[in-house]
């Protein structure tokens, strides 16, 4: 097992997730978990690659969504990659994982951030 553990969070097709999977063998990292906030194609990508997946449906969890999200992240995680993850991560989670979260949003969040 690789020494650098990554948790990927996605909400859609899983294109960025698949790209991260395809490059694991070239770099020293291991994708240990996928977290999604809805049923989406990224789940299929995880299943095809034997990567554990946790589905936390925001519409059902409501206010407890981010509490469950925080619990789902393993303590040995080195990096969280938001790969097309729609929910806007609250400050408390950003503070806990300071300098360990990357957002792959394809545009300026201030201009095109959506509702989250």
Spell out what each predicted region is.
Residues 1-116:
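One-carbon transfer enzymes
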């Amino acid at each position: 097992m690789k020494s650098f553990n990554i948790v990927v969070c996605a909400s859609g097709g899983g294109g960025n997730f698949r790209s991260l999977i395809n490059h694991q063998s070239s770099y020293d990292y291991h994708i240990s978990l996928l977290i999604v906030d809805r049923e989406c194609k990224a789940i299929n990508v995880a299943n095809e690659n034997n990567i554990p997946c946790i589905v936390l449906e925001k519409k059902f969890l409501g206010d407890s969504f981010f509490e469950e999200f925080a619990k789902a992240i393993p303590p040995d995680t080195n990096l969280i990659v938001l790969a097309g993850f729609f929910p806007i991560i609250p400050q408390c989670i950003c503070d806990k994982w300071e300098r360990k979260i990357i957002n792959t949003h394809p545009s300026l969040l201030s201009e095109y951030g959506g509702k989250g």
